[in-house]
């Protein structure tokens, strides 16, 4: 996260989950349980989630991925957000509007932050949302969600959690704003999901990656020890 977004993120961290925008929660559980922070919070709610990850949603039930427009050398999401990489800060790529994004070299190597996002997603998010952002039988495919959900809406729900109640189930998304294993890498996770959603990054572990920069290490150490 850049210094320009610090004020917004502080507000987001204390935001009430009830204020989250209408739409899809980032992580859900079938049981009626309070939102909670911490690594593996969703798994703690469901009991044996680590041993039995959520089943992936059947392919026939998945909605078609929204189109991503490429005009004048720029990538624009269906929500109008430009995700073209513009500059690097703290070892991460950002757009001209300081929104985190990804960059893949011509030979196929992903930037380190996007690779970091893959690792953090696989460690913290896939139990509910399925591997590679593909979704599950009870949680959405985040690779699709990020194409229509704004970056700050993504942060708000990730920080504060969300609860959706309907006639079929009571779905709970835990809050991760105080979980450093997630929050210190939230931009990386977002960039990874963007790369998956646009189709620029295939499923599985990225085959090639850039090296981890000193700037990334410094920011990582500062966040994890803060």
Curated annotation (Swiss-Prot):
Cellular component GO terms, alphabetical: periplasmic space
Post-translational modification: Binds 1 heme group per subunit.
Keywords from the UniProt entry: Electron transport, Heme, Iron, Metal-binding, Methanol utilization, Periplasm, Signal, Transport
Region ranges (Disordered): 43-68, 203-226
Main location: periplasm
Binding locations of heme: 125, 128-129, 173
Superkingdom, natural source: Bacteria
UniProt xrefs under InterPro entries: C-typ_cyt_methanol_metab-rel, Cyt_c-like_dom_sf
Signal peptide annotation: 1-22
Intracellular or extracellular location(s): Periplasm
Gene3D superfamilies: Cytochrome c-like domain
NCBIfam families: 4cys_cytochr (TIGR03874)
Protein name: Cytochrome c-553I
Gene: cycB
């Amino acid at each position: 996260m850049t210094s320009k977004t610090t004020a917004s993120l502080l507000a987001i961290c204390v935001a009430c989950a009830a204020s989250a925008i209408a739409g899809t929660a980032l992580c859900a559980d079938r049981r009626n349980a309070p939102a909670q922070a911490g690594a593996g919070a969703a798994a703690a709610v469901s009991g044996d989630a680590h041993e039995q990850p959520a089943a992936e949603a059947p392919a026939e039930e998945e909605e078609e991925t929204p189109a991503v427009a490429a005009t004048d050398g720029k990538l624009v999401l269906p929500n109008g957000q430009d995700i073209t990489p513009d500059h690097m800060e703290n070892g991460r790529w950002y757009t001209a509007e300081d929104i985190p994004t990804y960059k893949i070299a011509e030979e196929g190597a992903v930037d380190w932050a996007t690779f970091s996002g893959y690792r953090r997603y696989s460690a913290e998010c896939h139990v509910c949302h399925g591997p590679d952002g593909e979704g599950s039988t009870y949680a959405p495919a985040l690779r699709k969600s990020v194409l229509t959900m704004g970056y700050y809406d993504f942060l708000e729900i990730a920080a504060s959690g969300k609860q959706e109640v309907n006639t079929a189930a009571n779905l709970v998304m835990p809050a991760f704003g105080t979980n450093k294993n997630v929050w210190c890498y939230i931009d990386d996770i977002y960039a990874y999901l963007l790369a998956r959603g646009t189709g620029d990054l295939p499923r599985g572990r990225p085959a090639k990656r850039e090296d981890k920069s000193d700037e990334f290490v410094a920011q990582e150490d500062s966040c994890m020890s803060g």
